[in-house]
Swiss-Prot record:
<dbReference type="InterPro" id="IPR002866">
    <property type="entry name" value="Maturase_MatK"/>
</dbReference>
<keyword id="KW-0819">tRNA processing</keyword>
<dbReference type="GO" id="GO:0008033">
    <property type="term" value="P:tRNA processing"/>
</dbReference>
<keyword id="KW-0507">mRNA processing</keyword>
<dbReference type="Pfam" id="PF01348">
    <property type="entry name" value="Intron_maturas2"/>
</dbReference>
<dbReference type="GO" id="GO:0008380">
    <property type="term" value="P:RNA splicing"/>
</dbReference>
<dbReference type="Pfam" id="PF01824">
    <property type="entry name" value="MatK_N"/>
</dbReference>
<protein>
    <recommendedName>
        <fullName>Maturase K</fullName>
    </recommendedName>
</protein>
<comment type="similarity">
    <text>Belongs to the intron maturase 2 family. MatK subfamily.</text>
</comment>
<dbReference type="GO" id="GO:0006397">
    <property type="term" value="P:mRNA processing"/>
</dbReference>
<keyword id="KW-0694">RNA-binding</keyword>
<dbReference type="GO" id="GO:0009507">
    <property type="term" value="C:chloroplast"/>
</dbReference>
<keyword id="KW-0934">Plastid</keyword>
<dbReference type="InterPro" id="IPR024937">
    <property type="entry name" value="Domain_X"/>
</dbReference>
<dbReference type="GO" id="GO:0003723">
    <property type="term" value="F:RNA binding"/>
</dbReference>
<comment type="function">
    <text>Usually encoded in the trnK tRNA gene intron. Probably assists in splicing its own and other chloroplast group II introns.</text>
</comment>
<dbReference type="InterPro" id="IPR024942">
    <property type="entry name" value="Maturase_MatK_N"/>
</dbReference>
Length: 511
């Protein structure tokens, strides 16, 4: 870190929040191009091959060409076919600049975070922190008491100026913002909808897109969190003066005194405040869950539409917000389909000569495997067709049979481990059938034989990789220490492998 700070002279630029000179340092693009986008921006790279002096020639020439309209004129659609060399040169320029932008715009955030960590002598422990393994138990404990879910599709920025305005609150350097605005206006269409010539550009600029997207969504969340915490006064306050809280707490105290002092109206403040809302941001969606009534949830939907249109100048379509009742609809989260199921329970009670039969409905969260989207992912990866029929997958000729079987078995084990908390395993068995038969057809294709002949020759060796021990994988067994019965019980667990969670959560897009 000290080496990178010395190369880039960040202390001098940080004093005035001035990042524009960093665009002309060749080391920026060396670090950005060589560090890999999955690593931190402060990862040191010893094999850069440059000395401690910054070179201005390369980037000055490139920046100068960007401002020359003759080199970046609007070209017809068939220009890339007629002049492939100039087209690749143009995308090469934008790729270099995008890598540098992705590196530079993170500097203010990273320096602020590093200075915060250096100032902290002791890490404060918090009891409210939860790992990813507690997400689904949290849903089982809390969502069973909720009624409605707002499924919101996050807005995309309609114009690049919105992204620049959001970054203006963090980056005080006007020159850097002007250069970023120029770059986004010039290459926005090619970056969002790349063609074959620029397909590699969008993959390498993923970090820049993620940073801009999180900055865009963070502007909504910073306002929304405050509104959610102060939601008890939204019912009687006009949206034009929403943040005005004059006499608000005085009115609440007055209501409390009335309810507490009058014996007939003794109650809690809970009846005055509106129901609490659980908030989750997942991929491109917001999930708001509440135990309020349908009128309360509909009021939140109308308010959110007005809030985004007035405070963020964005036209928000009402059809992007879905009001779903948990007992009738599923909501997708972390690769699972969750649903609130009502389980009837009959309790018989006898008091002296009277017998009472009480019918109770117990709410329980059910989590299912999204079999349709999983089959679509398997079909995209050439394991089956769109109807779920297994097909042979082309493999390299140098792979041995054991390696092929191990690859198919590893995919099957990942699915069973990740979806171990599913309420029903029928969908998992169908996935195992598809992978097992696809593996057999792949091996038969390699040996130029039929599946039946190959299975007879191979025997039961092929099935061993797919026959998982459900006692070890799907359940854990714990002794009942507090019970008088010396027995054991089984409970559903959540085996969320953090290493593979991204691949399985995003199975709609990749396998």
């Amino acid at each position: 870190m000290e080496q990178i700070r010395r190369y880039l002279q960040l202390e001098r630029f940080q004093q005035h929040d001035f990042l524009y000179p960093x665009f002309f340092q060749e080391y920026i693009y060396v670090f950005a191009h060589g560090r890999g986008f999955s690593r931190s921006i402060w990862s040191e790279n010893e094999n850069t091959g440059y000395d401690n002096k910054s070179s201005l020639r390369v980037m000055k020439r490139l920046i100068t060409r960007m401002y020359q309209q003759n080199n970046f004129i609007i070209l017809p659609n068939d220009f890339n076919k007629k002049n492939p060399f100039l087209a690749k040169k143009k995308f090469f320029y934008s790729q270099i600049i995008a890598e540098g932008f992705a590196f530079i715009v993170e500097i203010p955030f990273s320096l602020r975070f590093i200075s915060y960590l250096e100032g902290k002598k002791k890490i404060v422990k918090s009891q409210n922190l939860r790992s990813i393994h507690s997400i689904f138990p949290f849903l089982e404990d809390n969502f069973s008491h909720l009624n409605f879910v707002l499924d919101i599709l996050i807005l995309h920025p309609v114009h690049v100026e919105i992204l620049v305005q959001i970054l203006r609150y963090w980056v005080k350097d006007a020159s850097s913002l002007h250069l970023l605005r120029f770059f986004l206006n010039k290459y926005w269409n090619s970056l969002i909808t790349p063609n074959k010539a620029s397909s590699s550009l969008s993959k390498k600029n993923k970090r820049l897109f993620v940073f801009l997207y999180n900055s865009h969504v963070g502007g909504y969340e910073s306002s929304f969190v405050f509104i959610r915490n102060q939601s008890s006064h939204l019912g009687s306050t006009p949206f034009g003066v929403l943040l005005e809280r004059i006499y608000f707490y005085g009115k609440i105290e007055r209501l409390v005194n009335v309810f507490v002092k009058v014996k007939d109206f003794r109650t809690n403040l809970w009846f005055v405040k509106e129901p609490y809302i659980h908030y989750i941001r997942y991929q491109r969606k917001w999930i708001l869950a509440s135990k309020g009534t349908f009128l309360f949830v509909k009021k939140w939907k109308c308010y959110l539409i007005i809030f985004w249109q007035w405070h963020f100048s964005l036209w928000f379509y009402p059809r992007r917000i879905y009001i779903n009742q948990l007992s009738n609809h599923y909501f997708e989260f972390l690769g699972y389909l969750s649903n609130l199921r009502m389980t009837p329970s009959v309790v018989r009670s006898q008091s002296l000569e009277n017998t009472f039969i009480i019918n109770n409905a117990i709410k329980k969260i059910d989590n299912f495997v999204p079999i349709i989207s999983m089959i679509a992912s398997l079909a995209k990866a050439k394991f089956c067709n769109v109807f779920g029929h297994p097909i042979s997958k082309p493999v390299r000729a140098d792979l041995s049979d054991s390696n092929i079987i191990d690859q198919f078995g590893c995919i099957c084990r990942k699915f069973f481990h990740y979806y171990s908390g599913s309420s029903k395993k029928k969908s998992l068995y169908r996935i195992k059938y598809i992978l097992r038969l696809a593996c057999a057809r792949t091996l038969a294709r390699k040996h130029k034989s039929t599946v039946r002949t190959f299975l007879k020759r191979l025997g039961s060796e092929l099935l061993e990789e797919f026959l998982l021990s459900e006692e070890d994988v799907l359940f854990l067994t714990f002794p009942k220490a507090s019970s008088s019965l010396q027995g054991v019980y089984r409970s559903r667990i959540w085996y969320l492998d953090i290493i593979y969670i991204n691949d399985l959560v995003d199975h709609k897009y990749k396998l």
